[in-house]
């Protein structure tokens, strides 16, 4: 018994693009309360989101029978998740000085504004992702999944 792959674009469903819905929702709620003033803090939360994703289906392993899973590569969630991941990466863009050892007052003010802008962008993307998840976008169960990728059972003998 295997999934009946009829198109090359069906291989995407075997990638590590799946998450437990409750874990993803909880991560969004938790991340909204985090501070993003340092790159280390942004990296930590980005890694927490990344760690939620796993492969749950293989050509020989059927979609879980019970419950729903978040498919982060769905048309609605993919752009939100990608924007969120990009908003975490502000390394080497926060402080741009002519002399790193002695930033001027305007360079410090500019860096502070960039950190604030990054924080606003992160929170905005998390809230958008949370809204779509709460509305049920990007969630699939076995029946919905197997409309896209049929499970072929062995013929009775």
From Swiss-Prot:
One of its GO terms (cellular component) is helical viral capsid. SUPFAM superfamilies: TMV-like viral coat proteins. Keywords: Capsid protein, Helical capsid protein, Virion. Its main location: virion. InterPro entries: TMV-like_coat, TMV-like_coat_sf. The keyword Nuclease does not apply. GO terms for molecular function: structural molecule activity. Pfam families: TMV_coat. It is found in: Virion. Belongs to the virgaviridae capsid protein family. Capsid protein self-assembles to form rod-shaped virions about 18 nm in diameter with a central canal enclosing the viral genomic RNA. This is Capsid protein. It comes from Youcai mosaic virus.
